[in-house]
């Protein structure tokens, strides 16, 4: 029996579109407007933006388009983008440590002025309960485990003053005046306790200067 041929256009995957030029569902204009708003924000205050929608509504595609738009903007206005997918770390003992470890690894790697920021994030992570060993658990960031391990060794004999570390980290961000965009997707795929843990750490870090959070999730599932 001859099998029916299926046109390629009818096939799709769970992977989001990443190029606005290939936009089939009209997400690009909204993503462009959102990227422009993020790039144009001149204040030093931290911002948290949320993109709500059910599964399959195009949230991940919008996030990808926003990152694409920001990459091709004026260099002086480009934020340092850190993408974090908590679903990769789902089931780990401490999701918050994975998130801080990602920031620690990515920020200095993408912007030289953030080397001290990365060190302070390691100390801040340690002050919140010890640095987790994340070696080999961060996709696409092979240095993450080594960075966190070295941070743990430095913190072994140091007193941990969370308010002082937070103040020092805020001071460095104010000095650099470089906007950071933290993109977090697939929050609604986490277990309820993991969602609470992630939102708790975001709340604790939301007031850092020059840091913008862009979150995507199904509000009916994650909240």
Question: Which residues make up each language-model segment?
Answer:
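Walker A/P-loop-proximal flanking segment of P-loop NTPase domains
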Residues: 1-89, 97, 205
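Non-catalytic regulatory/linker segments of enzymes
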Residues: 4-12, 76-78, 102, 143-144, ...
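Conserved phosphate/pyrophosphate-binding and hydrolysis machinery centered on Walker-type P-loop NTPases
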Residues: 20, 24-28, 52, 56, ...
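Short, flexible/disordered secondary-structure transition segments
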Residues: 45, 110-114, 213
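Short coil/turn segments at secondary-structure boundaries
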Residues: 47-49, 115-116, 183
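A short acidic (Asp/Glu
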Residues: 62-64, 94-95, 192-196, 223
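P-loop NTPase nucleotide-binding core
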Residues: 63-175
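Conserved Walker B catalytic segment
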Residues: 161-220
């Amino acid at each position: 029996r001859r099998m029916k041929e299926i046109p390629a256009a009818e096939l799709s995957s769970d992977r989001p579109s990443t190029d606005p030029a290939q936009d089939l569902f009209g997400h690009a204009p909204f993503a462009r407007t959102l990227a422009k708003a993020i790039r144009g924000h001149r204040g030093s205050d931290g911002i948290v933006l949320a993109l709500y929608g059910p599964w399959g509504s195009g949230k991940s595609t919008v996030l990808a388009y926003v990152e694409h738009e920001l990459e091709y903007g004026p260099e002086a206005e480009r934020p340092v983008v850190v993408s974090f997918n908590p679903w990769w770390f789902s089931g780990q003992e401490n999701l918050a440590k994975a998130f801080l470890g990602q920031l620690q690894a990515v920020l200095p790697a993408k912007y030289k002025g953030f080397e001290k920021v990365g060190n302070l994030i390691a100390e801040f992570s340690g002050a919140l309960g010890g640095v987790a060993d994340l070696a080999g658990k961060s996709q696409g960031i092979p240095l993450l485990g080594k960075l966190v391990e070295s941070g743990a060794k430095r913190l072994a004999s140091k007193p941990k003053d969370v308010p002082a570390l937070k103040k020092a980290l805020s001071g460095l961000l104010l000095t650099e005046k470089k906007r950071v965009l933290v993109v977090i997707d697939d929050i609604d795929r986490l277990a309820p306790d993991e969602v609470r843990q992630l939102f708790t750490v975001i709340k604790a870090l939301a007031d850092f200067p020059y840091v913008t959070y862009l979150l995507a999730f199904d509000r009916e599932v994650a909240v």
